[in-house]
Amino acid sequence: VARAEEALRQTAITQPAVLATDEGLTRMLAAYGIKPDFAMGHSLGEYGALVAAEGLPFADALEAVSARGREMTRFSPDDKGLMAAVFAPIHEIERVLKTISGYVVIANINSNRQAVIGGASDAVRRAMESLVRAGYEVTVLPVSHAFHTSIVASASEPLRRVLQRLHVAEPRLPVVANTNGEFYP
C-alpha cells in the first residue's frame, strides 16, 4: 500500500488518475440521470470539465494530462519547489511575499481570502513562517513540484506541442475558465 501511495504522489501517475476519476464520476452520475448544467475544474480539473462538456474527447484529454505529468517529471531541477495553501486576505499574502528573499509567488488565487503560494523551497518555507507569525493558517501541499510557477516552465513547450494536436470542439455545456472564473466565449 505504501508503494502505491508513493506512486500516486508522482505527477506522471497522478494527473491521468485524476482525469480518469473525473470521467468515471461524470459517467456514474449520468447513469443515474444526473447531468451538469455547466462544467468547471481547477488547474488539471479543467481538462475534466472540458471532457464533461464534450469540448474535448477523453482520449485527447488523457494524452494531454499524461504529457503534462510526464514533462513535469522529465526535468529534475535541484529544487522542485514547494507549494502551500494560505488562508489570508490576498493583499496580506502579497505584502508578506514582498519581504521574502528568493523566489516565491502567488501561484493560484482561489478566493479573496485563500491562495496558494509556490516557488523555491527555502523561500516558500520563509514565507510560510512569516504568514504563521502574522496569525494566518498555512498548509503545505503534498505535490511533487511547485506547479503554476516558473519552476515547471521548462515543461511548457513540449506540452504546447501536444496541445496543438488535440481535437478541441465547442463545448456543449458552458465551461468556466479557471484563469478568470468567466464562462468560455
What is the role of each PLM region?
Residues A107-R113, L141-V143:
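RNA-recognition motif
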Residues V1-I13, Y103-V105, I109-N110, T179-E182:
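Acyltransferase loading domain of fatty acid and polyketide assembly lines
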Residues V1-T99, E137-A146, S150-V152, P171-R172:
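FabD-like malonyl-/acyl-CoA
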Residues A85, V132-P185:
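Acyltransferase
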Residues G41-S43, I109, A120:
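Conserved alpha/beta-hydrolase "nucleophile elbow" surrounding the catalytic nucleophile
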Residues L97-I100, V124-A134:
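Short amphipathic alpha-helices in soluble, non-transmembrane regions
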Residues F87-I90, S101-I106, Q114, L159-V162:
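Phosphate/diphosphate-binding loops
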Residues I90, G119-V124:
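Helix N-cap motif at beta-to-alpha junctions
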